[in-house]
Amino acid sequence: MEMVTIVKANALAKIAGNEVWIVVTDAKSPPIRPLDGVHLVDLDVNYYTDYYGLKGFYKKNRLHKERLEKLLNEIKPDVVVATGKHEKNFFSSLRLPSKPLLIREMHFEKHYRKKIKNITLRQKVSDWMATQYDYHWKIKGYDHIVILTEEDKERNWKGRKNVLVMPNPITSKCEEVSTCEKKTAITMGRLVPLKDFSSLIRIWGRVAEKHPDWRLEIWGKGELEAALHQQIKESGLEGKVCLMGYTAEPLKKMSQASMYLLSSQSEGLPLVLIEAMSVGLPLVSYMCPTGPRDIIEDGQNGYLVAVGDEKTFAERVCQLIEDEPLRKQMGQAGLEESEKYRIEDIAQRWMQLFRELLAKKSSRRNSR
């Protein structure tokens, strides 16, 4: 989320007439990417130090509200976009005489918590309450809600006129494009249950029976690393499925593969699929909610597979392995499709959205 926010802020700041601010609560370290013409304000609330427990959290939340309210009344912005961190607890109750346009960004599919396997009843109840809090109780004071995919809007926000769709942009660029000739498939992400890499390892077991000279690279770190290592060993896939660890150059690694695979149970908008397209990779993905359906046109730039259908997933991978011209054709189609996620285009779409929403808000005020 931090990377996407910085990339969008930098792009918006380059547009004539804009003044852009990023407000944070505890800037413990420099931004992960340099800011270009963007004001950075640290409210110095530091939620995770000094105070512990519920009482401490409420004190921090009150301090956060006071400092944010004071800042916004000083700079008097036309538009305020909340990303849904701690400010969601009080944002709609801020006293702002200048009446800016209040927008809430939602970065996750509404029911993503339900997709996590092997959780206790207590966790399920807690997750249900968190979903009600995030998606019902605390969004009523915003002028508009911005979500990532048309699929999410159709599934979870039907009939809500103030819900709009805006995809995230590609946050990095790579000059190298895949030749789609190397005998390597690739996937990336945190090694956590939601990404379901264990399913992908089982899928690759099927693939390896027909194509033992191909291998799968899994890039990322996380809590399931030891368990996945054990699964690979027990499946006899050592050397055919490789846990590669962390990389600071994900697009470069993608450009050295021939297809991208996604096995997640849930996503918001899987940026990795867009990044993979941007280096010319064909895609094979579960049709998890949400995102893959917005990105992949089945049979054109990749394949969509029902979640859990490991047999069909393996068949689609084998189809790409066995048909190099098809791999290259789909990779080229994805490369062209990725153009609409360029940050320059996304920034202009945000500007058009701001203009339209501000004009409507002004019209409503004048008609009173």
Each PLM stretch: what is its role?
Residues 11, 15-58:
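N-terminal strand-loop element at the rim of the active site
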Residues 246, 265:
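Aromatic "clamp/platform" in nucleotide-sugar-dependent glycosyltransferases that forms part
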Residues 297-299, 303-310, 318-324, 339:
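Conserved acidic donor-binding segment of nucleotide-sugar-dependent glycosyltransferases
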Residues 69-70, 124-144:
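Membrane-proximal helix-turn-helix segments that form the acceptor-binding/catalytic region
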Residues 82-88, 106:
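Short His-centered aromatic/hydrophobic patch
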Residues 2-7, 183, 190-206, 223-229, ...:
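A conserved mid-protein helix/loop that constitutes part of the nucleotide-sugar donor-binding site
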Residues 135-174:
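Donor nucleotide-sugar binding/catalytic pocket of nucleotide-sugar-dependent glycosyltransferases
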Residues 282-286:
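Short hydrophobic beta-strand element within catalytic cores of glycosyltransferases
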